[in-house]
Amino acid sequence: MGSEMCIRDSSYVTQALAAVLQLGVTMDYSIFLWHSYEENQERFPDDKKRAMAHAISNTLTSVIGSSITTVAGFVALCFMSFTLGLDLGVTMAKGVIFGVICCVTVLPSMILVFDKAIDKTRHKAIIPDLGVISGWVVKHYKAFIVTFIIVLIPALWGYTHYEVYYDLAGTLPGNLDSVIANDKLDETFAMNSTHIILCDSSLEPKEVNEMMSKIDDVDGVKATLGLDSLVGPTVPREMIPSDIKEVVMDENYQMLMISSEYKVASDEVNDQCDKIEKIMKKYDKNAMLIGEAPCTKDLITITNHDFNVVSTVSIGAIFLIIACVFKSISLPIILVAVIEFAIFINMGIPAFTGTKLPFIAGIVIGTIQLGATVDYAILMTTRYQKERSRGKDKMEAISIAHKTSMPSI
């Protein structure tokens, strides 16, 4: 976070999330190293430095592969049109890189320096021996494949049908002054959303009144307000005092206000904005519809595009990285498919519980979950390949890999 001062300003969302995310994501690498060190201490009980050297060597492949995939997941956020993605993506990618560097340099040094203190404060393992579970999972692997296929269908349905909301004002605490004021305005004047049209100031009053009359007929429009509707079309603009005219008009634009009875981010107000835009474009091709509702409508379009881009980039990048690390085409397909399956379940549950998620959740959660949890798949796969290279058959190799990886995972 300190490096942000030297590069650029960061958003309050990034400041709130980055430290927690970095701790949760990069802590894995420390745990991987520690468990490998404990395992090598049994091989070299009288030489802690040698045990640590072997621990670093054994975990380096999985840590580097895991960290690169995590970085790729965060870098994928940078492809968002929504600039929060760039801000969060760059900050977290840097954080993972710094975390890995500290894990393979500072952490081994600190473990060796404080080794005696660590031994004195050691307590009984809280996590029980998972050998029985590992054996049971490996023995019933066919049942898990069948379960995967059965659960995949509802998980995929839920993943494509969960609801999102774009009106973040609803998530704000009810005791904020701004929220209280908006609630009172809504109760007193039934104000839901207000649109503003910026059109050419050279438009004739007759054209403006004709345009506003058509907009009045659009469903959900409560009232329209402009300079000509206030003073009437019979009053020449030259006779209107300049201090009044300057409030709603300048040399280039004039402002028209539209009061809507629909709520922001609703399907009704989005359809209303489309109809208003069609009407105003007939009179001024360069006219702009602005306000909270039109802005939110644009946000919906942008985030839908961002979701597809970020998902494609993150899956593609992580696939290529795993393929390069393991020098295999089949392994990245299996690993990415397993993690995507977990993402389908995670993001699909709200569809069955009726829970609405904020619009940013689908983009950020999917990308972070893919980049962060693929670490565990890489750790287990690395150990599996190691055991296979030692001459073990596939069942024995996966059993050892599963048993030794479970405590770290």
Give residue spans per PLM region.
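Membrane-embedded transmembrane helical bundles of large multi-pass transporters/channels
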Residues: M1-E4, R8-Y166, K281-I409
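Structured non-transmembrane domains adjacent to transmembrane bundles in polytopic membrane proteins
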Residues: Y165-L331, A337-K356
